């Protein structure tokens, strides 16, 4: 089964709701329609930007999809500051990032919490982008494959085959995020292949063949084609390079060139 690459921009805590409109407009208009036939392009934006992006995408019938960067594991209730998956679903979010390394580090999010957030998203028709990846000391010790496979297993706990079929996994080596260091294409392939092997074990060949595994970690226009060209890498979770609409369009076009 040919997997259509997904290029997902993670804006992190950047761009207000007015800047968001201009950025998505530039992205959509800089990327000719035929490229959207080869790659799916998404932006995951701050909560305060979602309504503006939704109005633009739906009003102008843009091919770009959108989502959030986090979600509560709870459906509703006395959880001050939290945003539920049902709230995101009402805004027609297609995606939500869960377990990003910055959430794991700064908010002490565990694999168990990540799995609960993924479950909440799926229960509301939203595809989670489940992030996993090793820190530098694990990479240097040479145990990164085993580490990431086990982290992925725990971060997907409780999801059945049908839910996994609607899940995206993003491999983001922590040492390559925001540092300018980039894992080689071979590094990305090694781990993404092992993750796919885990999905075979959890859900069978058919689900594993269809599930998209992204690489995240200082993805740039110059490097994306080689990475996405690997057999088990199906796109990128793009940070800083997604904040400029035209630059992000170029990156997506480069990914489409190998699709």
UniProtKB/Swiss-Prot annotation:
Homodimer. It catalyses: D-glyceraldehyde 3-phosphate = dihydroxyacetone phosphate. The active site is at 100 (electrophile), 172 (proton acceptor). The gene is tpiA. HAMAP family: TIM_B (MF_00147_B). GO terms for molecular function: triose-phosphate isomerase activity. It holds the Pfam family TIM. Belongs to the triosephosphate isomerase family. Substrate binds at residues 10-12, 178, 218, 239-240. One of its GO terms (biological process) is gluconeogenesis. Involved in the gluconeogenesis. Catalyzes stereospecifically the conversion of dihydroxyacetone phosphate (DHAP) to D-glyceraldehyde-3-phosphate (G3P). PANTHER family: TRIOSEPHOSPHATE ISOMERASE (PTHR21139:SF42). Its EC number is 5.3.1.1. It comes from Corynebacterium glutamicum (strain ATCC 13032 / DSM 20300 / JCM 1318 / BCRC 11384 / CCUG 27702 / LMG 3730 / NBRC 12168 / NCIMB 10025 / NRRL B-2784 / 534). Keywords: Cytoplasm, Gluconeogenesis, Glycolysis, Isomerase. Gene3D superfamilies: Aldolase class I. It comes from the Bacteria. This is Triosephosphate isomerase. InterPro entries: Aldolase_TIM (IPR013785), TIM_sf (IPR035990), TrioseP_Isoase_bac/euk (IPR022896), Triosephosphate_isomerase (IPR000652), Triosephosphate_isomerase_AS (IPR020861). Its main location: cytoplasm. The keyword Isomerase applies. Pathway: Carbohydrate biosynthesis; gluconeogenesis; Carbohydrate degradation; glycolysis; D-glyceraldehyde 3-phosphate from glycerone phosphate: step 1/1. It is found in: Cytoplasm. It is an enzyme of class 5 (isomerase). GO terms for cellular component: cytosol.
